[in-house]
Amino acid sequence: MAIAKEDILEAVSSMSVLELNELVKAFEEKFGVSAAAVAVAGPAGGGAAAAAEEQTEFTVNLTEVGANKVSVIKAVRELTGLGLKEAKDLVDGAPKPVKESVPKAAAEEAKKKLEEAGAKAEIK
């Protein structure tokens, strides 16, 4: 007696997640396969270099405070929304990241504001 596809689908749809997990493991053992997703082949040749060039998130690091510490603290507060004490601690602890995981335009704007305040900053 053959089992119809509809019967199998009905049985699977009524299973709990735990039962489905056990079913998948049984299929893996019985047929010697893996339920892992198939990896898609990337572009040949310079694919890794192109991926490295297209960085989308950047970190702005405060490297040096400079002579006008008060202006730098104000700039840090404006950029981060930190309170006065937190901004002062960040500036005193330089070199430290000021903004992390931001788009390139936002990183460049933050660097510009810090440099206008008299600090030295870098984008990574």
UniProtKB/Swiss-Prot annotation:
Residues 94-124 are annotated as: Disordered. The keyword Ribonucleoprotein applies. It comes from the Bacteria. GO terms for molecular function: mRNA binding; structural constituent of ribosome. Keywords: Ribonucleoprotein, Ribosomal protein. Gene3D superfamilies: 3.30.1390.10, Single helix bin. One of its GO terms (biological process) is translation. SUPFAM superfamilies: ClpS-like, Ribosomal protein L7/12, oligomerisation (N-terminal) domain. The keyword Glycoprotein does not apply. GO terms for cellular component: cytosolic large ribosomal subunit. It holds the Pfam family Ribosomal_L12. InterPro entries: Ribosomal_bL12, Ribosomal_bL12_C, Ribosomal_bL12_C/ClpS-like, Ribosomal_bL12_oligo, Ribosomal_bL12_oligo_N_sf. Forms part of the ribosomal stalk which helps the ribosome interact with GTP-bound translation factors. Is thus essential for accurate translation. Homodimer. Part of the ribosomal stalk of the 50S ribosomal subunit. Forms a multimeric L10(L12)X complex, where L10 forms an elongated spine to which 2 to 4 L12 dimers bind in a sequential fashion. Binds GTP-bound translation factors. Belongs to the bacterial ribosomal protein bL12 family. NCBIfam families: L12. This is Large ribosomal subunit protein bL12. It comes from Paraburkholderia xenovorans (strain LB400).
